[in-house]
């Protein structure tokens, strides 16, 4: 094989379809937009949820609830994720971020009781579920709210 014999693999290169370049191309005249109407015009599209003038579903349904501006969103850590640490380790939010258990601490870290804990650990976090706190203490470890 020589340099002048190299060619791209079959099907790896596709020619861009240029519209509005003559009837023989199959995409001339109306450029694949069909005949007249809103969708044939420049910038012609209907907004999401538009139902042709009929009162749309999102306006037919009643408003519900509100957004609590004081809501704190915690980064969640489950008990089973804490098993990666050595026995007797003091698990802090900084350590959880450093080891990649948590990517973003958000408003703090909450430990939940999913899975089982097999090691005695001292866990420091911003919040604990009742089952998580109970499981940590049952293994002889300690939990501390910071």
Curated annotation (Swiss-Prot):
Keywords, in A-Z order: Ribonucleoprotein, Ribosomal protein, RNA-binding, rRNA-binding
A GO biological-process term: translation
UniProt xrefs under Gene3D superfamilies: 3.100.10.10
Biological source species: Staphylococcus carnosus (strain TM300)
Gene Ontology CC terms, in alphabetical order: cytosolic large ribosomal subunit
UniProt-recorded Gene Ontology molecular function terms: rRNA binding; structural constituent of ribosome
Record function comment: Binds to the 23S rRNA.
Quaternary assembly: Part of the 50S ribosomal subunit.
PANTHER family assigned: 50S RIBOSOMAL PROTEIN L15, LARGE RIBOSOMAL SUBUNIT PROTEIN UL15M
Database matches in PROSITE patterns: RIBOSOMAL_L15
Full protein name: Large ribosomal subunit protein uL15
């Amino acid at each position: 094989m020589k340099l002048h014999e190299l060619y791209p693999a079959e099907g790896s290169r596709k020619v861009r379809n240029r519209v509005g370049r003559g009837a023989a191309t199959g995409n001339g005249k109306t450029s694949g937009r069909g005949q007249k109407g809103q969708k044939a015009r420049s910038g012609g599209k209907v907004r999401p949820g538009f139902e042709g003038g009929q009162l749309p579903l999102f306006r037919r349904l009643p408003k519900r609830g509100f957004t609590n501006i004081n809501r704190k969103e915690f980064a969640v850590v489950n008990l089973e994720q804490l098993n990666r640490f050595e026995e007797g380790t003091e698990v802090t939010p900084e350590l959880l971020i450093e080891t990649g258990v948590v990517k973003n601490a958000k408003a703090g870290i909450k430990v939940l009781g999913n899975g089982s804990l097999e090691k005695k650990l001292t866990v420091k976090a911003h919040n604990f579920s009742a089952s998580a706190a109970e499981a940590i203490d049952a293994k002889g470890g300690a939990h501390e709210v910071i």
